Swiss-Prot record:
This is NADH-ubiquinone oxidoreductase chain 4. It comes from Rhinoceros unicornis. InterPro entries: NADH4_N, NADH_Q_OxRdtase_chainM/4, NADH_UbQ_OxRdtase, ND/Mrp_TM. It is found in: Mitochondrion inner membrane. It catalyses: a ubiquinone + NADH + 5 H(+)(in) = a ubiquinol + NAD(+) + 4 H(+)(out). Its main location: mitochondrion.
Amino acid sequence: MLKIIIPTLMLMPLTWLSKNNMIWINTTAYSLLISLISLSFLNQFNEDSLYISLTFFSDPLSAPLLVLTTWLLPLMIMASQHHLSKEPITRKKLYITMLIMLQLLLIMTFTATELILFYVLFEATLIPTLIIITRWGNQTERLNAGFYFLFYTLTGSLPLLIALIHIQNITGSLNLLLIQYSAQTLPNSWSNTFLWLACMMGFMVKMPLYGLHLWLPKAHVEAPIAGSMVLAAILLKLGGYGMLRITMILNPLTSHMAYPFLMLSLWGMIMTSSICLRQTDLKSLIAYSSVSHMALVIVAILIQTPWSYMGATALMIAHGLTSSVLFCLANSNYERTHSRTMILARGLQTLLPLMAMWWLLASLTNLALPPTINLVGELFVVVSSFSWSNLTIILMGTNIIITALYSLYMLIMTQRGKYTYHINNIKPSFTRENMLMALHLLPLLLLSLNPKIILGTMY
């Protein structure tokens, strides 16, 4: 594990000691190198070596998320170059340092062995994200968004800490490798019901569950591009990862307790998809689509079959890359037209034909077209939910149709039609941006050739 953590840590002095004209090149190149090193974690079960120490370990569930985390840092740095170009040099360095610190905390969160350590790191990821949103956001509402973000996440996860300490008292250990062998079965009683709720609520808020999702659109819309990317791609996955890890302690109570949350997720996924259809703000639309995709993941985790677990992990990785590329595209529009309103930035296909291709690919990935891994994840989830209850196929089908509708609506609103007169003199698309989109979409297409590396522990 240290072969990733130490190089990531050393990216900070690299940022501050680089020459002013070399900051972007150095940090991007070295972070890309780190992400290539981390690819070896995906292959660990074909060899004899296990990546396990007393503090950090990596297994097929955390490895794909780990690789996604390291893969996104160079992409975030590439995406942030334009809107930081007018900032003074110390601020650029501080911004990159925040991103590196966030990546470091996320790597340690996904690989923590001890649940209390996991909790501490889970909370620590709030700090850099909050600074990024409230310091570099675009509008003045960013402070409001920061408050929402902090308040929801902290209030949701305080009961989790108390529950973890309680479990520590009962079992005597919170080590993830030991607890699956020593965990006692939780009988159905009032106190255990509250224990289940306390354990799940922190992750449900982070996912977010429909009804607890109000912080997400606010935070997404106000965050700068790197903030939006890391929020959609990785911070939401912390919730799913935590749920997958902690359900093995809470059995067999989950099968009794899951019903209201399953209903809420199934209802919420259709509701948030429908909300997407009437959004005017591009970033807000992508944020609500994130909520709808994560509702599918919650359903999959709560059904608790091997197929649904595989679907949940595949969908988390797929959604991480998809939502990230959509935010990048929205940002490239915003940098040219200085507006996130879709009506004001329409007809861009005539001006930026190459960007239109990226928009088409990203929209098709979002509506889960084969051969992307979004389809793999959604198929697993739909099939496992159908075998749980036949009625869910109606809700799932409706959701898939509405997803297709808003994805195509987003594409048509931004790319088609006659362009408005105020965007005659926009800049062409840069090589940097094309590279950025390619590095997002290539993994999505290539992973469909070998999806077993992202199907998690159950494969």
